[in-house]
């Protein structure tokens, strides 16, 4: 690649199932590399498997990238000079490339059935599971005609080179597959429909992709891609062979690869819990890369400025939910209060949770919990006591704080609060401290815990005095009186 050529990377998922974090990590690294180099991020949909692909999954991919803020320069709904960007709409392009490969002798029709290939291996004393034996390379015109007369439908196979296939992986260094270790492989089904093995490198060539950043699990297919790129160059379809970088595997529990069945692999499960994009992307960036030692907390702009695929680690990366949670909590704390309030309201609305506070009071309540939550979903448990239909005193909290000692506290609190003229947190605090800490000589925990349980129903809540202010005089006093009735007479 010359100095004047622009980096072009691609993210090309298949629209099956729900987006998972390993897939998103791949998208993030491609996006960050494009942004770091001033290059182009191409989003392409590999939807050639009609039985597995779904429109629902396609829309989920769009939703995922948009939620995360990983904008694409070319692709669905954006367009670009090398469209269409859905492989299901590129059938004519693949047919033309196949015809040119066949005409140039780079590919050939193969009629052998899997059973015939296995039988030939057994007859020759070879392992029957070796795979295709390149038998059809040497068929005569008469043999091909005979097979066609039988009604056989051939696949198209690429003629693999007789040399070693090697590349300098940007993550793993030099990789070599010995000559003859990869057999001629199918480019089409017997129906003539193109396979991933054709369309993926073909589109990379036609879309002028310069760097392929993808998961380590795809490394064994790279020799086939190299061979096809070489053939595409010879027939004038491709200009170059892209540089490859195979990203480290993401592990789940133990040493197993994180699979779609693992709960933490589901991107939308993290969103539903209340992860914010900044927190999740920060953590995913650390799955195989680091910005610097002892510097795990950073934003996307900082990542883009520092990211180079050459710095990606080749060792497997383990998904650590606790660390992901901790980083998300930090990013929540870093949000502007107004921004946090909007995001919290949206999250609660999405999950059917309404807090019975007006806009100003909700903003104040949001600020109270911003430093006390790990994910947005945690806020509901802290704030739902503002709703009378959600307010209930937890029996364990009552047993702990609303015993005989609680009666005197509540009596003194009710008397003190009755005289508060302006129902604000500072005046509420002053009145309660004077009555309970000075008047009853109680330590703060003993003084305020019964009031917290009475007002919020639990031992864990936002700051007490601010909560009482937002709850309002009438509801606060009503709840304290009701709790006093529970205690009975001192």
Curated annotation (Swiss-Prot):
Binding positions (ATP): 260
Xref: Gene3D superfamilies: 1.10.10.350, Glutamate-tRNA synthetase, class I, anticodon-binding domain 1, Glutamyl-trna Synthetase, Domain 2, Glutamyl-tRNA Synthetase, Domain 3, HUPs
Catalytic reactions of this protein: tRNA(Glu) + L-glutamate + ATP = L-glutamyl-tRNA(Glu) + AMP + diphosphate
GO cellular component, one term: cytosol
SUPFAM superfamilies, per database record: An anticodon-binding domain of class I aminoacyl-tRNA synthetases, Nucleotidylyl transferase
GO biological process: glutamyl-tRNA aminoacylation
Subcellular location per the Swiss-Prot or TrEMBL entry: Cytoplasm
GO MF annotation list: ATP binding; glutamate-tRNA ligase activity; tRNA binding; zinc ion binding
Transmembrane residue ranges: none
InterPro entries: aa-tRNA-synth_I_cd-bd, aa-tRNA-synth_I_codon-bd_sub2, aa_tRNA-synth_I_cd-bd_sf, Glu-tRNA-ligase_bac/mito, Glu-tRNA-synth_I_codon-bd_sub1, Glu/Gln-tRNA-synth, Glu/Gln-tRNA-synth_Ib_cat-dom, Glu_tRNA_lig_a-bdl
Similarity section: Belongs to the class-I aminoacyl-tRNA synthetase family. Glutamate--tRNA ligase type 1 subfamily.
Subunit field text: Monomer.
Note, other: Was identified as a high-confidence drug target.
Function statement: Catalyzes the attachment of glutamate to tRNA(Glu) in a two-step reaction: glutamate is first activated by ATP to form Glu-AMP and then transferred to the acceptor end of tRNA(Glu).
Alphabetized NCBIfam families for the sequence: gltX_bact
Name of the protein: Glutamate--tRNA ligase
Species, as recorded: Mycobacterium tuberculosis (strain ATCC 25618 / H37Rv)
């Amino acid at each position: 690649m010359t100095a004047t050529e622009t980096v072009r990377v691609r993210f090309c998922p298949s629209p099956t199932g729900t987006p998972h974090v390993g897939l998103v990590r791949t998208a993030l690294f491609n996006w960050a590399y494009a942004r770091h180099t001033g290059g182009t991020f191409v989003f392409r949909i590999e939807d050639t498997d009609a039985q597995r692909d779904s429109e629902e999954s396609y829309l989920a991919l769009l939703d995922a990238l948009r939620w995360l803020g990983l904008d694409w320069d070319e692709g669905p709904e954006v367009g670009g000079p090398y469209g269409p960007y859905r492989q299901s709409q590129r059938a004519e392009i693949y047919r033309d490339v196949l015809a040119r490969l066949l005409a140039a002798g780079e590919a050939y029709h193969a009629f052998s059935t899997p059973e015939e290939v296995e039988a030939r291996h057994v007859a020759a004393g070879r392992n029957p599971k070796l795979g295709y034996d390149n038998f059809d390379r040497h068929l005569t015109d008469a043999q091909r005609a005979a097979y066609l007369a039988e009604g056989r439908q051939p696949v198209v196979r690429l003629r693999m080179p007789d040399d070693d296939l090697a590349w300098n992986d940007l993550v793993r260094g030099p990789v070599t597959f010995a000559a003859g270790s990869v057999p001629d492989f199918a480019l089409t089904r017997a129906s003539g429909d193109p396979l991933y093995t054709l369309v993926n490198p073909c589109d990379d060539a036609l879309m002028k992709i310069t760097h392929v950043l993808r998961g380590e699990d795809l490394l064994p297919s790279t020799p086939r891609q190299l061979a096809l790129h070489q053939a595409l160059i010879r027939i004038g379809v491709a200009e170059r062979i892209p540089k490859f970088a195979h990203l480290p595997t993401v592990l789940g529990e133990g040493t197993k690869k994180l699979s779609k069945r693992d709960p933490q692999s589901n991107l939308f499960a993290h969103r539903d819990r209340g992860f914010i994009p900044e927190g999740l992307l920060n953590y995913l960036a650390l799955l195989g890369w680091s910005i610097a030692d002892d510097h795990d907390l950073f934003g996307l702009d900082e990542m883009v400025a520092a990211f180079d695929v050459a710095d990606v680690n080749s060792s497997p990366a383990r998904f650590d939910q606790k660390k992901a949670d901790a980083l998300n909590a930090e990013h929540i704390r870093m949000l502007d209060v107004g921004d946090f309030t909007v995001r919290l309201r949206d999250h609660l609305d999405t999950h059917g949770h309404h807090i019975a506070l007006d806009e100003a009071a909700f903003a104040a309540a949001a600020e109270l919990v911003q430093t006390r939550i790990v994910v947005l979903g945690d806020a509901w448990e802290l704030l739902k006591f503002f709703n009378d239909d959600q307010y209930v005193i937890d029996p364990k909290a009552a047993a702990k704080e609303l015993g005989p000692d609680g009666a005197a506290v509540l009596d003194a609190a009710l008397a003190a609060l009755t005289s508060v003229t302006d129902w604000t947190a500072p005046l509420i605090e002053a009145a309660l401290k004077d009555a309970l800490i000075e008047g009853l000589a109680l330590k703060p925990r003993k003084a305020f815990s019964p009031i917290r349980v009475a007002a919020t129903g639990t031992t864990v809540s936002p700051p007490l005095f601010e909560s009482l202010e937002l709850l309002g005089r009438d509801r606060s006093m009503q709840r304290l009186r009701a709790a006093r009735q529970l205690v009975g007479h001192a």
